[in-house]
Amino acid sequence: MFDEVSVGYDRMNTVSTVGIDALWRIATTRAVDPRPGQLVLDVAAGTGTSSAALARSGARVVAADFSPGMIAVGERRHAGNPNIEFVQADATGLPFDDDSFDAVTISFGLRNIVDPDAALREFFRVTKPGGRLVVCEFSRPPASVIRGAYYAYLEYGMPVFARLASSNPVAYAYLMESIRDWPAQQELAHRISRAGFERVAYRNLTFGIVALHRGFVGESKGDL
C-alpha cells in the first residue's frame, strides 16, 4: 500500500493537514534533541522528510522503512546528504545490534505496524542506556467538541483531499480508520512503559489531534 502512495506521500500529508505537519515535525525534532555525532534511528521514515530534519543537527540518521517504494524515493531526494542512510527494515525485527542508537523516533507510523508492542520492545532493545524514544502519532483530542470536529473531518474532509492529491485514495481510507482506532494518550504511554522505557510522558499538539510521547532507557539497562 505505501509503495503505491510513495511519490505523492509528502504532498498529501501537507495538503491534508493544511501544512501543520511541518510544526509537528519541528516539535518532534526538538523532543528527540539530536546532537552532532549521535546516531538516531528514524523508524517508518518514509521518504526521509523527518530524517532530514533530524540530520540538520549534525547527527547521523538511519532512516528505516518497510516499504521499498518509500526507500527508493527517499534515497533519490536525499542522495547528497551524507548524514542519512536508508535501510529497508521491519520495525518488529530490526536488523541492528542491541544498544546501537542514542535515540529512536517514529512519526505517524506506529499505528500502521501489525504488532506495535513488539515494535516498542525492539525500539527499547536497540536504544543505548541513557537514550530516548520519541513517538509522534495521531491521537484522541480530550475535548469532546474538538474530537467531534476532528472525526467529522476524517470522515468527510480528508477523503476529498485524498481524491485531489493522492494517486490511491483507498489507501488513505485505511489510514483514516487506523487513526480512529488508535488508543488514547494514556494507553500509549502505558504501552511504552511496558516495553521497558522509563519516565514516559506525553504532551498534546494541536488540541490533542497529535500526541508526542517520550521515554528514556535507564542507565542500568545493561545490568538487566
Model segments located where?
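C-terminal alpha-helical "lid/dimerization" subdomain adjacent to the S-adenosyl-L-methionine
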Residues: 136-191, 195, 201
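A short SAM/SAH-binding and catalytic strip from SAM-dependent methyltransferases
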Residues: 102-116
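N-terminal, positively charged/glycine-rich alpha-helical extensions of SAM-dependent methyltransferases
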Residues: 1-8, 154, 165
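Conserved alpha-helix/loop element of class I SAM-dependent methyltransferases that forms part
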Residues: 8, 18-38
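A short acidic, Gly/Pro-enriched loop at the edge of an enzyme's catalytic core
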Residues: 92-103
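Class I SAM-dependent methyltransferase SAM/SAH-binding core
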Residues: 39-93
